[in-house]
Amino acid sequence: MIARRMLCARPWGPSCVVCALCGALAALVPAVGAQEQAVPAPGTPAPPAHTASEAVPPAPEPRAEGEQPSPLVPTALPVPGGAVAARAAPGTVGPRLWEQLLQWRVQHGDEHQAPQMAYEIAANNYDIALVKSIVDLRMGTGHIHHNLNGNGAGGMANGTPTLSPYVHLFFPTYQNLSLKADIAIKTNTPSADVTALFGMDLYSKVRRQHQLQVRRARNSMLDAFAAHLRGQHAAREAFLAELDELLSAYSTLLEAQVTEQECTRLVRTMRIQRYQAHSVKLRSATLKHARAERVARRARKTFTALYQDFVRKCGAFEGNDPETFMLHLAQVVPQEPVSSTALLSVENDWEFLKNREDLETQAEARAVDAISYGFNVESGVGSEGKSLKRILANVRMDFPGGGFWLGLNLPYPQWSRVEVKFRLTWDPLSIKYQELSRQTLQLHERLSALKLQDAYEASERKVLGLRHTAESLGWEQEAALTELNILRRSAQTHQKWLERGAIGAHQHARAQHAYLQALITLAKINIKILKFNLETASSFRPVL
């Protein structure tokens, strides 16, 4: 507690940032007595001579008699593995702190569970569409007739039941090839009537319709898979966002503590200087101090709430001292380089590729719907028992606004008793509908071209923006690292000056505060780079 007494005369408080920091860093501070002194009195020996690498210490700020040092920040710098690790719970603060927190967050987060299930659903739908496009099998009992009166009405002698089962087999992607077998069975006879038909489309939209359904299902599956991959990054992105917010709250808390102590020092100095209670300056300073206290309390509440939520989600030990935990966590944020953007292009942008595929799929759907012609042929035979009785042939043709169907039934061997069936349908207004449909299709094509151009330009702007962001982040990281090194050396120099009694604790604390803020700034920039690298990896297709 020597370091604590050296900086602050207030009693120990668990809610005080300075108390926690001083306690965590006490092991790094030598047991020095009252090292904070004003300018040496006449006759006292001068401070030790400075080396060439040390700057000449500034004159200490004047302080009124009886004023206590300002408890802003600790007198010693936190270093990984030192007092910070010693005061933490085992296994929660150490060199592998970052990996432990991130691994827990990813394994126990639910950000990737919903995309995983959505991908499995889309994969099942794709399998269904694929099977339906290859083969379609339909089987049934057909109509079952039974005369309960037993009078033989309707051809059912003595109430004998009749069955008409059927088997229909279709191959949609193979010119809608079809095989049909219909059987009429009477239970009182050993034979059955069988009708077998073979048919195919010479021209129709059935094949393209099924191919379109498969394409849509495949696109949905690929989109779900991409979302699943992004879901694996979602836990990392959520972890980084929460940590960035927590570091911002901690920085705000430190700043509020500094402002509060500055206001406290100002009010104390003015009272020592005999300012009257009704003095405008003293009243203004007192009001400013009260506001600073409120801001500090709000900052403390915000930081505490975010800290508790963060450690709960990451499986950290809540008994850790928050300030010690935050100082060490700010130091272990990985310092990665910014991902290269040289290979980023529009053709690798997943979002642009998805937009282009969606527009092409929509255009294909409109083209399929616009098909109004179709030509189907079907032929087969009919038998009674083992005897061939007839030959069947059907022709169906569809055209804009109507269609016709022609059926031939050739009895065998009585060829002269040919049975012909014919059906014609026509809608006179369909000609007008077809003209409007063609105009609509052309407008859709032009609109799709505009949308594709907009998507291309948006992707180009995205690539350029990412390149500028990468350049800016690299510069910010370099500048923050340079500033941190400068402020670290400055804080170490102020530490030596404080030990020699050349400066006061207030000047020393301000140097320490500047170093801590620079440390947090660098950590936040490193987090931004990590988020940028994740976004780039998940937004663009890898170039092989």
From Swiss-Prot:
Where does the signal sequence lie? 1-34
Q: Which intervals of the chain are annotated as region Disordered?
A: 38-69
Keywords on record: Signal
The family classification in the record reads: Belongs to the TP096X family.
Q: What is this protein called?
A: Uncharacterized protein TP_0966
- What lineage is this protein's organism placed in? Bacteria, Pseudomonadati, Spirochaetota, Spirochaetia, Spirochaetales
